[in-house]
């Protein structure tokens, strides 16, 4: 059997972190060798529940749906696993959520296996099962209900996909972490007792109490369903123990049965119980809702008391703890989600964005690194998987030894860990109204986004895409989208008729403010539909203070509720504005008419190519610490930041602190998808090609090394981009081969975070040659993992366009 290191083909010595145990290595191989199939079981059970309970309030209908699924779905315990719990009928299969939509599923039944990337397999039996339930869901789904709420004024944006809202209309809870600490300390019994007391105190003459009454009943149903799910594993593990091939396996299965009889209903007392409790909840949340970015929160903080107690009592060793952690991470990769073909352009690699956060500071502002922080690093290094998404919270006092260990993991070349910076995130949260003690307890929840675990509402990011380069083209074209020919904004003048750069700036501001308002209208309509149609009970029950308020998350039950969209093409906007200002209006080397013609024709012909070369070679570029380009994009971005802050979300004034919007640059792989529909841009980019991702520079436009990139990024209004400022960098593995090189990188990171107040950074440590070879010989690189955006994915499951985008990124040296 090959080891992870041998399959990955990396030159880095993973002996530094040791290897998986034989059984976990086999488990990992079995999971990765398994083809992902479409699974209709959940959809069939959900249909049955919706039909039987169609007259009930939606909160009860949703509760009975989850009960039906958990009590009847297929269960299994893998022969190598120490943990029980599965999302679908088989590992890595993708369940279907018809209450959100069946439309794309039915349209693509015969296409899933033919995709360029994100391939899924499907049997004829599954196709028939899905077709058989389709009539019930035809108009009875979230997508349909959201569609009828959308005002006529925004239909053009939905028809053209301008705001990229498909994922929001097809998806459930996202970008949050429930209160795992409370789950472990109190068990679901503690939540149940609180609900019982809250229901007993209701004044049913108060009209608001009626919805609360049904919400509380739905929580009782859900908790009973979770208990039934766990007890089914008690029976299964006991049955398997009777047929176990060895005495050791028999004892392990009996221990699984004992633990499942206890958690998550009762508090956890050991590390094994804590892991099982967390996994049950993590798994069931992704059975309840078609979401993503459901994250583990500050794992090393709430788990450490159990680790410490077990080590002191001799119940566990460091090796046994690491093995159980690797088991949990392999379990995490079994969770899967199918998206429509068009949606995969923005979420390439079937990512679930399940984040684990370690490090950072305690609530009393001390370094939070503990022995478990190191064991998480070690276990993630051993499993070498794209999930979970590992984030380290950096702060000025971060333990130096721990920082060294983080770089050693990074050298393994699978894009982890990413770093978020306490020095900018905590003050930004406090400025937005988050209590200081909660701000110090934040975690990553998805890619680069952050929130307070167990207290933050639904979807703190991931709302509208705002394609800045396309907005610029619409501005230049007098409010008309050049790609579709449809009017997207009022007419503020055509670029060909402009006499100064100031005219363009004025038109940009008016157009961007208009489109921002339109995005808010779309978001609000979809959020209203989500609130009405698909309340998620377990997720709400485990988030403070939904029980206290008697409201689910989408009604405003969380303590905090902030949301942001995703702004795409930051660098393209910067470079385009710099080229227009310098080459057209300052130097006069191009007329507005010439530039516009070149854009319309995608730089065709000899003159077009010459103009393209001029734009690329002779204009200032973002990413080089050049104030000319950097300040232009900051000023242009500030307009969006100012406008989006004017509009509260649908939970504003209904309980949560916040209820407002802010900006964010976590564009995932939308730079590829959004680029497909964007014509040529004034930075020299060709039509249909990827945009720049996150806040990273355009490919190979950053000529002055990594330090200059960091300085350019730091000029963005980071303290206002609270939804995340995502920076990807790529370095050759040989760059980190020596100890002195590693220390150079650490010094660079500390400078970026301490002095420049950077928000986030992550690295692809892989050579261009390896990536090209993986395209040509995918069978030799099954385990090659790359950082796509704020998440990692297996290179071979990505579409060719996304692979090319990653290959094209600038490769830095230190």
Where do the language-model regions lie?
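Conserved catalytic cores of very large enzyme subunits
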Residues: 2-216, 252-255, 259, 263-814
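Extended non-globular scaffold/tether segments
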Residues: 217-231
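Secondary-structure-rich domain cores
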Residues: 230-238
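Extended, structured, electrostatic nucleic-acid-contact surfaces
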Residues: 238-239, 307
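A conserved hydrophobic secondary-structure block that centers on an alpha-helix together
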Residues: 240-248
